[in-house]
Amino acid sequence: MHEMSLAEGVLQLIEDAARKDHFAKVTTVWLEIGQLSGVEPEAMVFCFDAVTRDSVAQGARLEIMTLPGTAWCMACAETVPMAEVFGQCPQCGGYQLQVTGGTEMRVKELEVE
């Protein structure tokens, strides 16, 4: 389950921000996760709850926003939506696709006290 190490990385970012900006508690974390990232949102919530115990983010609500997958189709010369990494172009049926979006994961915003 790679979500555990990802959740630990998110907590590290939060703790670094808490030291830098002098806040004591995080109440909400907004996390953007790309549809093609391979991250399971339910597993991420579970792991986040586990790793944030006894931290500035203990009890924080994790809000996950899913970013759509996109790719550049070399045959169509168009940006197209993608539901899976090795899918085919919805316009021409081709497989010459370069993923351009939906693989990222980032902390978008923190609500703090």
From Swiss-Prot:
Keywords: Metal-binding, Nickel, Zinc
Pfam families given in the database record: HypA
Residues holding Ni(2+): H2
Binding site for Zn(2+): C73, C76, C89, C92
Top-level taxon of origin: Bacteria
Gene Ontology BP annotations: protein maturation; protein modification process
Protein name according to UniProt: Hydrogenase maturation factor HypA
GO MF assignments: nickel cation binding; zinc ion binding
Functional description taken from the UniProt entry: Involved in the maturation of [NiFe] hydrogenases. Required for nickel insertion into the metal center of the hydrogenase.
Gene3D superfamilies per the UniProt record, alphabetical: 3.30.2320.80
Family recorded in the similarity comment: Belongs to the HypA/HybF family.
